[in-house]
Amino acid sequence: MSRRRALALRDALVASLVVGLAVSITLSETSLVVLAAWLVWTRHARIMSRASWPLLAPVLAFSAWSILTAALSSTPLESLRATKTLLPLATLWIVFGVLDDASAARRFGSRLLWALAGVAVVSIVQVTTCAPSRLDAVESSWPPVVRSVLGKCRRAHGFYSIYMTLGGVLAVALAATLPTLAVAGRRRAATTVAWLTSAVALGLTLVRGAWLGFGAGVLFALTGVRRWSIAVAVVAAAVLLLLAVPRVRQRAETIADPADPTARERFAMFDAGLTMLRSHPVIGVGLGGVKRLYPVYAPPEAVRRHTSHLHNTPLQIAVERGLVGLALWLWIFAAFFARAWGLLRRVPGDAVAERALVVGALAAVTAFLVAGLFEYNFGDTEVLLVTLSVMALPFVVERDLAQRPA
């Protein structure tokens, strides 16, 4: 195959990855596998040097420890099977490898926003056309695709199986793309409409943890956006739009209410998780162990007696992999922040588009980590794939700047 055709194939696969991130985990994972094969098949120079593997040490250390704790758990075969959830971590390196330069990274981020804006339109239609009979059920007589999209429409879920996934994906993507609104140029109006549409869909998920993560990401983004007045105006418009929706406003009023039934259940899960951690502080209970042991550790006030996760990512990591595993997991993100922040300080002041990419990635990871205090989003593959894809973008910028003439 000629170089031209090979690059055309890669570009088509990157486009399919973007679409998959927005609508289908099967499409996104398939695209990633084929892109990885493309890198190997073309013997791409970016897979031959250590510089092509950002965050390699913390990711490998975390993965190795996860496998070790699985092998040492009381149900090693079950836990070792669960280590397949480590495979999505390769997304960081695959996306980094297939994006040539900062321009390609900008196109990737822009296309992701537009793909999610399309999903947001579908999500808004889901909620606004929802009949009482479909609030928590599906119409069995409808075609499968229509049934899955327009069924269970009490809360917006897009093409995902549950609203929490859509909320997590939108929180990360909106934080990542907010800084680009200030440098969008002639496309600013259209891009702003796409961003606001996605923000409305985020509100209609009614996922409070995703809202808080989004808010944290926005605050971080505003610290690095020079034309901050534009970003503030857009965010303010989104908030006003959402507060005009009674269900969204009522849901927001319960965020700090400790008497809220969902909050009480999360407190019960937190207590159970801490008890499990005290019993297995070093190596944890193994991957998948929470599902097996939660009925034993659930406190009397817990309504749910079975769960596979604790709605708190750091606690889930610590319980399943021990405190060592938590430290290694934190190392991944600490290393990312240190390197991306250092890059931001080196980006020339006139390289506004590159700065927006780096600030957006930092804001997106902030949103992911804060939202993870209320949901095990590290275990939500769709959310994790989007986050890792965005995390690759600063490293693309870093490589591009290093290759430019002084």
Can you name each region flagged by the protein language model?
Residues 17, 35, 67-68, 90, ...:
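Alpha-helical transmembrane segments of multi-pass inner-membrane proteins
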Residues 121, 125-130, 204, 222-263, ...:
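A membrane-periplasm/extracellular boundary helix in multi-pass inner-membrane enzymes
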Residues 257-271, 283-321:
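Long extracytoplasmic/lumenal interhelical loops at the membrane interface
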Residues 12, 16-35, 48-53, 64-89, ...:
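Interfacial transmembrane-helix termini
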Residues 1-78, 97-113, 183, 189, ...:
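Transmembrane signal-anchor hairpin modules in multi-pass inner-membrane enzymes, especially those
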Residues 134-138, 349, 401-406:
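Short, Lys/Arg-enriched, Gly/Pro-containing loop segments at transmembrane-helix junctions
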Residues 17-27, 318-321, 355-395:
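Membrane helix-loop boundary segments at the extracytoplasmic
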Residues 83, 252-255, 266, 277, ...:
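Hydrophobic alpha-helical segments of integral membrane proteins
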